[in-house]
């Protein structure tokens, strides 16, 4: 899932490129932890019967998370199934046209599909971050019901000046620190270096102006224990 970096946010972040100087004299670049988030939406209209998982619960791909009450759809599916069974016998006996047979088969399959939509399942493994609706609420197709995040690997964007960029390359290992946990140290790696500069005049003419160039760098972190969570501030120390 591609993340876009709004220009306004880049400009704001660029003003705070270097958060602080570490004890060893190394600069640390500030970033905010992000994760791949997947929104789950209703595909049918109905009343929420119940949530099958709570916020913060781990979930598996294909796991049912939300049940929508749709007895009317189940009733319609039962009728469509019975009609098709009768149609099969008539078709075999030559008493029903192929057109009518196909129409009843489609109605049966369509009704069964809508019944499956009564249960909202997670398409990915991860953790249920947010539930946006309550039991008993009426929802319609497209309404966002929940968000699941894959926390097994997270990332942060940092912004480095032009002079520093030359020494960086994708795959390079870096150190990161979590201020909220007493400067706990984590290993990370540079996954993407974005080629377009930000926070600088469009027409750079002098060497002094080039020092104002900053580039977005995506740093990824394995997060097996899920210690790093979206929204946390992380400080990245680049190799010399």
Labelled PLM ranges:
Residues 32, 47-54, 58-64, 114, ...:
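Surface-exposed patches in structured soluble domains
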Residues 26-28, 35, 43, 123, ...:
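Extracytoplasmic
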Residues 1-25, 175, 224, 235-240:
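N-terminal export/targeting signal detector
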Residues 24-26, 57-135, 155-157:
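Amphipathic alpha-helical coiled-coil/rod segments that serve as protein-protein coupling scaffolds
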Residues 65, 72-73, 180-183, 240:
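Short, charged beta-turn/beta-strand-edge "cap" motif at the junction between a beta-strand
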Residues 41-43, 196-207:
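Short, solvent-exposed secondary-structure boundary/capping segments
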Residues 3-6, 160-187, 211-236:
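Surface-exposed connector loops and short turns at secondary-structure junctions
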Residues 10-54, 58, 220:
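N-terminal beta-strand block that forms a small beta-sandwich/beta-barrel module immediately after a flexible targeting
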């Amino acid at each position: 899932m591609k993340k876009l970096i709004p220009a306004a946010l880049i400009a704001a972040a660029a003003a705070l490129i270097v958060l602080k100087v570490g004890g060893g004299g190394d600069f640390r670049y500030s970033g905010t932890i992000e994760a791949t988030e997947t929104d789950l939406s209703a595909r049918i209209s109905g009343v929420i019967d119940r949530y099958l998982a709570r916020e913060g619960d781990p979930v598996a791909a294909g796991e049912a998370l939300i049940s929508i009450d749709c007895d009317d759809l189940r009733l319609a599916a039962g009728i469509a199934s019975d009609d098709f069974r009768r149609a099969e016998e008539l078709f075999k006996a030559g008493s029903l046209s192929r057109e009518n047979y196909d129409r009843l088969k489609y109605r049966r399959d369509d009704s069964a599909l809508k019944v499956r939509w009564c249960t909202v399942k997670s398409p990915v493994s991860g953790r249920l971050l947010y539930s946006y609706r309550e039991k008993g609420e009426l929802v319609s197709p497209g309404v966002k019901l929940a968000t699941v995040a894959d926390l097994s690997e997270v990332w942060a964007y940092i912004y480095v000046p032009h002079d520093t960029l030359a020494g960086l390359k994708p795959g390079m290992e870096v150190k990161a620190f979590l201020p909220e946990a007493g400067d706990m140290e984590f290993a990370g790696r540079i996954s993407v270096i974005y080629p377009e500069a930000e926070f600088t005049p469009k027409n750079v003419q002098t060497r002094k102006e080039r020092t104002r160039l900053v580039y977005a760098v995506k740093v990824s972190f394995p997060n097996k224990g899920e210690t790093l969570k979206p929204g946390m501030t992380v400080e990245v120390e680049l190799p010399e």
